[in-house]
C-alpha cells in the first residue's frame, strides 16, 4: 500500500522540500511548515554545508582530516551536504618515515 505524502510528519517525501512537523511545532526558520517548501530565497534547511538557509561557500571545511591518510572535505557551494569522506589513494604512504 502506497500512501500520499503527508506534510507535517517530519519526513521529506515526494513533492516536499522540507518537513519540520506541524506549524505549531516547527522550529526551522528555512521551512514553511504549512507547505513543506523552503521559504522564498532559501537554498537549504539542514546539512553540514547549510547555514542560515543558504549553502556555505565553496572551500568551507565541513569534515576535517582525522588521520594522515584522510583528506579534509569542503563544501562545494552547490549543496547542503558535505561530500563523501575521501582518503589518499591506495599505494600512497601515510606514515612519516
Curated annotation (Swiss-Prot):
**Disulphide bridges:** 7-36, 18-31, 20-26, 30-53, 44-50, 49-75, 62-82
> Where's the Disintegrin domain?
4-90
Q: Name one GO molecular function term.
A: metal ion binding
Task: Read off the InterPro entries from this record.
Answer: Disintegrin_CS (IPR018358), Disintegrin_dom (IPR001762), Disintegrin_dom_sf (IPR036436)
Name any cofactors this protein relies on: Zn(2+)
Copy out the cofactor comment. Binds 1 zinc ion per subunit.
Q: Which family does the entry's similarity section mention? A: Belongs to the venom metalloproteinase (M12B) family. P-III subfamily. P-IIIa sub-subfamily.
Write down the SMART domains for this protein, in alphabetical order. DISIN
Q: Does the keyword RNA-binding apply?
A: no
Q: What does this protein do?
A: The hemorrhagic metalloproteinase-disintegrin-like bothrojarin-1 is a potent inhibitor of collagen-induced platelet aggregation by blockage of alpha-2/beta-1 (ITGA2/ITGB1) integrin. It does not present any fibrinogen-clotting activity.
Glycan-bearing residues: 32
Record-annotated residues binding Ca(2+)?
6, 9, 11, 13, 16, 19
Tissues of expression: Expressed by the venom gland.
Protein name, per record: Zinc metalloproteinase-disintegrin-like bothrojarin-4
PROSITE patterns xrefs: DISINTEGRIN_1, DISINTEGRIN_2
Q: Which keywords, in A-to-Z order, does the entry hold?
A: Calcium, Cell adhesion impairing toxin, Disulfide bond, Glycoprotein, Hemostasis impairing toxin, Hydrolase, Metal-binding, Metalloprotease, Platelet aggregation inhibiting toxin, Protease, Secreted, Toxin, Zinc, Zymogen
Q: Where in the cell is it found?
A: Secreted
The Enzyme Commission number assigned here is: 3.4.24.-
Which Gene3D superfamilies does the UniProt entry name for this protein?
A: Disintegrin domain (4.10.70.10)
Task: Name the GO cellular-component terms.
Answer: extracellular region; plasma membrane
Per the UniProt entry, what are the Gene Ontology biological process annotations, in alphabetical order? Answer: proteolysis
Residue interval(s) of motif D/ECD-tripeptide: 68-70
Pfam families membership: Disintegrin (PF00200)
Amino acid at each position: 500500500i502506497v500512501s500520499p505524502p503527508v506534510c507535517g510528519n517530519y519526513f521529506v517525501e515526494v513533492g516536499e522540500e522540507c518537513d519540520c512537523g506541524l506549524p505549531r511545532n516547527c522550529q526551522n526558520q528555512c521551512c514553511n511548515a504549512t507547505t513543506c517548501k523552503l521559504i522564498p530565497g532559501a537554498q537549504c534547511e539542514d546539512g553540514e554545508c547549510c547555514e542560515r538557509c543558504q549553502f556555505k561557500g565553496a572551500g568551507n571545511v565541513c569534515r576535517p582530516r582525522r588521520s594522515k591518510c584522510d583528506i579534509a572535505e569542503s563544501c562545494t557551494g552547490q549543496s547542503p551536504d558535505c561530500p563523501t569522506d575521501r582518503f589518499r589513494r591506495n599505494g600512497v604512504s601515510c606514515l612519516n618515515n
